[in-house]
UniProtKB/Swiss-Prot annotation:
It catalyses: pseudouridine(54) in tRNA + S-adenosyl-L-methionine = N(1)-methylpseudouridine(54) in tRNA + S-adenosyl-L-homocysteine + H(+). InterPro entries: Alpha/beta_knot_MTases, TrmY, tRNA_m1G_MTases_N. The lineage of its organism: Archaea, Methanobacteriati, Methanobacteriota, Stenosarchaea group, Halobacteria. This is tRNA (pseudouridine(54)-N(1))-methyltransferase. It is found in: Cytoplasm. Keywords: Cytoplasm, Methyltransferase, S-adenosyl-L-methionine, Transferase, tRNA processing. It comes from Natronomonas pharaonis (strain ATCC 35678 / DSM 2160 / CIP 103997 / JCM 8858 / NBRC 14720 / NCIMB 2260 / Gabara) (Halobacterium pharaonis).
Length: 198
């Protein structure tokens, strides 16, 4: 299973602070919605072998399971409604037990540190960063967990956590990419067996 962990630095944890009419004003929730859409959507289908984690406020981890998703649509507004619905269910997430407010959407109380520890055995943990090694150094047959940031760079604490937990720091090309575009390029690399099969 391919996994993507996206850190949302400014997204509010209070669902009442998330206006579907102003996604950029909701801590740039629009960026996270584009990441979700890039992770799951194909031309006429959804990727069912993908899991996306949104880390919100370093307090909640919202998980989207491709094999279970039923209400994900390609527009940012309806995607944001799923995120807001997850945040509205946050108080039902007790300890490490997740709440499940919608098919394929789960929320639990968990920091980035705890999430990195919980996915450590799932496959190689790869930080996507413009200063990393070229992506071609990653074995495309592996099922990596990619970690990337929203419109902000990783802060010092996140950088230290990733240095301690990640197996690699990888760049997807010579130019910095938006997070949602980086997800598309990472998918393409894995889909083509390292750019060898089209």
């Amino acid at each position: 299973m391919r996994q993507f962990i996206v850190i949302g630095h400014d997204v509010p944890t209070d669902p009442d602070a998330v206006s579907l009419a102003d996604l950029p004003g909701a801590g740039r929730l629009d960026v996270l919605c584009r990441c979700l859409n890039s992770a799951f959507f194909l031309s006429h289908d959804l990727r069912d072998n993908v899991r996306v984690w949104l880390v919100v406020g370093d307090e909640y981890a919202i998980r989207f399971e491709g094999s279970e998703l039923r209400r994900l649509n390609p527009d940012e507004r309806s995607t944001a409604a799923l995120v807001r619905g997850a945040l509205a269910a946050r108080e039902k997430a007790i300890g490490s037990m997740a709440a499940n407010p919608s098919p394929g959407v789960y929320i639990r109380t968990q920091s980035l540190s705890g999430l990195l520890e919980s996915v450590a055995d799932d496959g190689p943990l790869v930080t996507l960063h413009e200063d990393g090694q070229p992506v071609v150094d990653i074995d495309p047959s592996a099922e990596p967990t990619f970690v990337l940031s929203d419109h902000h760079s990783f802060d010092d604490a996140e950088t230290a956590l990733l240095a301690a937990h990640a197996d690699r720091r990888v760049s997807l090309g010579p130019e910095p990419l938006h997070a949602d575009h980086a997800i598309t390029v990472a998918h393409n690399y894995l889909d083509t067996d390292g750019y060898n099969r089209y």
